[in-house]
């Protein structure tokens, strides 16, 4: 059960990081290769 909780927390943090990264690099002029990351 403890391992499952760690896995869930890691997944949540991972998706939040992706959301924040996508929001900060939403400007195509700063990050023209954004399509390659999706």
From Swiss-Prot:
Q: So where does this one cross the membrane? A: 4-24
Its membrane topology, per UniProt?
Answer: Single-pass membrane protein
Q: Give the InterPro entries listed for this entry.
A: PSII_PsbI (IPR003686), PSII_PsbI_sf (IPR037271)
Alphabetical list of Pfam families matching this protein: PsbI (PF02532)
Q: Which Gene Ontology BP annotations are present?
A: photosynthesis
Q: What is its main location?
A: plastid
Name the GO cellular-component terms.
chloroplast thylakoid membrane; photosystem II reaction center
Compartments where found = Plastid, Chloroplast thylakoid membrane
Arranged from A to Z, the UniProt key words for this protein are:
Chloroplast, Membrane, Photosynthesis, Photosystem II, Plastid, Reaction center, Thylakoid, Transmembrane, Transmembrane helix
Q: How does it assemble?
A: PSII is composed of 1 copy each of membrane proteins PsbA, PsbB, PsbC, PsbD, PsbE, PsbF, PsbH, PsbI, PsbJ, PsbK, PsbL, PsbM, PsbT, PsbX, PsbY, PsbZ, Psb30/Ycf12, at least 3 peripheral proteins of the oxygen-evolving complex and a large number of cofactors. It forms dimeric complexes.
Record family assignment: Belongs to the PsbI family.
Free-text function comment from the UniProt entry: One of the components of the core complex of photosystem II (PSII), required for its stability and/or assembly. PSII is a light-driven water:plastoquinone oxidoreductase that uses light energy to abstract electrons from H(2)O, generating O(2) and a proton gradient subsequently used for ATP formation. It consists of a core antenna complex that captures photons, and an electron transfer chain that converts photonic excitation into a charge separation.
Instruction: Spell out the protein name for this chain.
Output: Photosystem II reaction center protein I
Tell me which species this is from.
Answer: Porphyra purpurea (Red seaweed)
């Amino acid at each position: 059960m403890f391992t499952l909780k760690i896995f869930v927390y890691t997944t949540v943090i991972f998706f939040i990081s992706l959301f924040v990264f996508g929001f900060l690099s939403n400007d195509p002029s700063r990050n023209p290769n954004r399509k390659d990351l999706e």
